Amino acid sequence: MAAKIIDGKTIAQQVRSEVAQKVQARIAAGLRAPGLAVVLVGSNPASQIYVASKRKACEEVGFVSRSYDLPETTSEAELLELIDALNADNTIDGILVQLPLPAGIDNVKVLERIHPDKDVDGFHPYNVGRLCQRAPRLRPCTPRGIVTLLERYNIDTFGLNAVVIGASNIVGRPMSMELLLAGCTTTVTHRFTKNLRHHVENADLLIVAVGKPGFIPGDWIKEGAIVIDVGINRLENGKVVGDVVFEDAAKRASYITPVPGGVGPMTVATLIENTLQACVEYHDPQDE
């Protein structure tokens, strides 16, 4: 069996085009364009690349993009003060603070300072809690982007045995909640899981997010499984690969995401969707 490739690049472009049309319609109706503030502290090269792609996507769809590039020496108090100002700014619908933050700044405190209505990354405990309660509002971008991919490929997830490898707050844990909402029987594995291979071999839908190149061998994949590879790992030769051995897995899976060009573009596309949603649901003038 040769797997069908899930083309995240194409689906992400569709999502962005849909958002751009909605933004044009808003402006034509006399409403303002959504605004996103992107905050980068320090000069981490990978973070700079991610931030640049987010800003570019904003401008492409017609958002107002505001950039805050702060020096490595920025204190936690200064960063929190900026977030307070952005929370109070009525032209800003979304606030994105690029992680990781420099040593000495508490990630949790910073993310919790962002108002839940402007938490377009979907990391605030309020928004994660809404997802757990089956009443999601702004959803974590990577898990939501994966669900969008499955929906756009008309993959019926109800009743599937889904296995999530990796239990991070950014992907693994919220992904498990999204899969429950999507009707899956969901298992989350982590560093203490025994007999990982057994879980993988029984997965109808496998989502891998550990950040280790080639962590899952292709011969572990169940025949006909759907494989979603969230890993983005740069090898010493410069090649970018996922957490799954792609060539081998693609021989057994029914669908598989490539790396690059699979999940990555959907994360940014979902951020754009979330910013529009925040603008419409929380910050537009409400009819009395």
UniProtKB/Swiss-Prot annotation:
What gene name does this entry carry?
folD
A Gene Ontology biological process term? tetrahydrofolate interconversion
Q: Which residues bind NADP(+)?
A: G166, A167, S168, I232
Q: Does the keyword tRNA-binding apply?
A: no
- Does the UniProt entry include the keyword Membrane? no
Function statement: Catalyzes the oxidation of 5,10-methylenetetrahydrofolate to 5,10-methenyltetrahydrofolate and then the hydrolysis of 5,10-methenyltetrahydrofolate to 10-formyltetrahydrofolate.
Residue ranges annotated as coiled coil are none
Show the catalytic activity: (6R)-5,10-methylene-5,6,7,8-tetrahydrofolate + NADP(+) = (6R)-5,10-methenyltetrahydrofolate + NADPH; (6R)-5,10-methenyltetrahydrofolate + H2O = (6R)-10-formyltetrahydrofolate + H(+)
Q: What is the lineage of its organism?
A: Bacteria, Pseudomonadati, Pseudomonadota, Gammaproteobacteria, Enterobacterales
Enumerate the Pfam families for this protein.
THF_DHG_CYH (PF00763), THF_DHG_CYH_C (PF02882)
Family per similarity comment: Belongs to the tetrahydrofolate dehydrogenase/cyclohydrolase family.
One cellular component term from this protein's GO annotations in UniProt: cytosol
Quote the HAMAP family the UniProt record gives.
THF_DHG_CYH
Tell me the subunit arrangement: Homodimer.
InterPro entries found in the cross-reference section? Aminoacid_DH-like_N_sf, NAD(P)-bd_dom_sf, THF_DH/CycHdrlase, THF_DH/CycHdrlase_cat_dom, THF_DH/CycHdrlase_CS, THF_DH/CycHdrlase_NAD-bd_dom
Pathway in which this enzyme or protein is active? One-carbon metabolism; tetrahydrofolate interconversion
Q: What UniProt keywords apply to this chain's record, in alphabetical order?
A: Amino-acid biosynthesis, Histidine biosynthesis, Hydrolase, Methionine biosynthesis, Multifunctional enzyme, NADP, One-carbon metabolism, Oxidoreductase, Purine biosynthesis
Record-listed E.C. numbers: 1.5.1.5, 3.5.4.9
CDD domains linked to this entry: NAD_bind_m-THF_DH_Cyclohyd (cd01080)
Designated name of the protein: Bifunctional protein FolD
Task: Spell out the molecular function terms from Gene Ontology.
Answer: methenyltetrahydrofolate cyclohydrolase activity; methylenetetrahydrofolate dehydrogenase (NADP+) activity
Q: Which domain of life is it from?
A: Bacteria
